[in-house]
A protein has these predicted regions:
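Substrate-binding pocket helix/loop in short-chain dehydrogenase/reductase
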Residues: 83-84, 91-93, 178, 189
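N-terminal Rossmann NAD(P)H-binding glycine-rich loop of SDR-like oxidoreductase domains
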Residues: 10, 14-18
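Short, small/polar-rich loop/turn modules that mediate ligand/substrate recognition or access, typified
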Residues: 159, 164, 218-221
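A short, exposed helix-loop element centered on a Lys and neighboring polar residues
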Residues: 107-108, 153
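C-terminal substrate-recognition "lid" of short-chain dehydrogenase/reductases
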Residues: 119, 198-225
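Conserved NAD(P)H cofactor-binding loop of Rossmann-fold oxidoreductase domains
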Residues: 75-81, 228
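Catalytic loop of short-chain dehydrogenase/reductase
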Residues: 121-159, 172
């Protein structure tokens, strides 16, 4: 039985990943969310963790998150509406803490167990926006996602222990957030994608599932699912 932690599990991608994993009897799922729990219809017992990651610190983290996860997926995506010209240190620090530092801390705390079990699968997430300097109002978010592409050398060395760590650079995806964008603006954005279409939630979730379930060789990689951008 393997223990899975999904951070940011109430996102569209998170819900799709849960739906694909929930029928697996060999997995124990722990789903983190901030405000609203993911809407999943299943009789299977799921450990729901409601917590604003900004309130996590080194003293209380082990009371909220366990330290023996076998699989960790970070889908946290806190966005603050700030550009480079008006960002505040407080908001940038908050965004980086939520999207990057706390997930790294949670990952670090489970590595000892992964080494002992000689198994670990970790998927972090980044954004195609960092390739272009981020959006005009997503400076802090894009900076935090850039940080998520940093793979510590200590983690790189764990490949020999069957602990595989990868970061997905996710392209513009057909989620609720993008559906709320003015249609004309969204069409203009799609035209910038060589594949000339948005990624589907299935596209992204399928890669996540592959990396945690079927992957036996890919590690320490930034995997782009961006339609050619």
């Amino acid at each position: 039985m393997k223990k899975v932690l999904i951070l940011g599990g109430n996102s569209d991608i998170g819900i799709k990943v849960i739906e694909k994993l929930i029928k697996d009897k060999n997995l124990l799922l722990s789903i983190h969310y901030n405000k609203f729990p993911p809407k999943i219809s299943s009789k299977k017992k799921i450990n729901l963790i409601k917590k604003n990651l900004f309130d996590i610190n080194e003293k209380n983290i082990t009371k909220i998150f366990e330290n023996d996860y076998d699989i960790i997926i970070n889908l946290v995506g806190y966005v603050s509406d700030q550009s480079f010209f008006n960002f505040s240190l407080k908001e940038v620090n908050k965004t980086i803490l939520i999207n990057s530092i706390i997930p790294y801390l949670i990952i670090r705390n489970s590595l000892k167990n992964m080494i002992k079990q000689k198994f670990g699968r970790i998927v972090n997430t980044s954004s195609v926006g960092i390739k272009f300097g981020g959006g005009k109002k997503t400076f802090a978010y894009s900076l935090s996602k850039y940080l998520n592409e940093f793979i510590p050398s200590d983690i790189r060395e764990l490949a020999s222990k069957n602990i595989f760590y990868n970061t997905l650079r996710i392209g513009v995806t057909n989620t609720k957030i993008h559906k709320n964008i003015i249609n004309k603006s969204l069409k203009s954005r799609v035209r910038l994608i060589p594949a000339n279409k948005l990624a589907s939630v299935d596209d992204i979730s399928n890669y996540i599932i592959y990396l945690i379930r079927n992957n036996n060789f890919i590690t320490n990689e930034i995997v782009s699912i961006t339609g050619g951008e």
